[in-house]
Amino acid sequence: LHVRSRRQRQMCIRDSKMQGAAISSWGVGTNLITSKDCPSFGGVYKLAAIQNADGEFQPKIKISENIEKITNPGNKTIYRIYDKETGMLRADLICFADETFNTGEDLLLFDPNATWKKTLLPGGTYTMRELLVPIFQHGECKYESPSVKEIAEFCRQEKETLWDETKRLFNPHKVYVDLSQKLYDTKTKLLNEAHH
């Protein structure tokens, strides 16, 4: 048994493995708990919609000078899109919760911050899986927790759908997260209304 400890970081571990180090256990400790490269969590809850008395959601938006901090309005869900032939991840698509898609039809994906960057997925060449799963509805738990073994197997299967380029520790390729046309149009409309 070979153990390496004392403030190990992912780059050091990667380099040691690439160099053929015969280490069977890593003592990561502090660097497992607190990322040295990104010590703060950037996720913050923001108001996206207000539900009226009729149960309809009125989209709301938070505007910022920083384009990445402008929120996506409305009651949303997200779909993971896979290549039908290879099973590999193509992109994630954020859309309104009431939007539906037909995988037999062409799907145009575009970068919401650079809309000229487009990818057309021909109908029949992709599959979609909704990522958001209801946990509570009307105060009742609707979710059956999987076992640890089931969670581990699910994670293994999902990891297999990632391209090697996205799993690199240094300079990884991004997994695309796009907006549906309907969500993009609503966001643009709210931004334009706010500046008039």
Q: Where are the model-predicted features located?
A:
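Gly/Ser/Thr/Ala-enriched C-terminal appendages of enzymes
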Residues: R14-H196
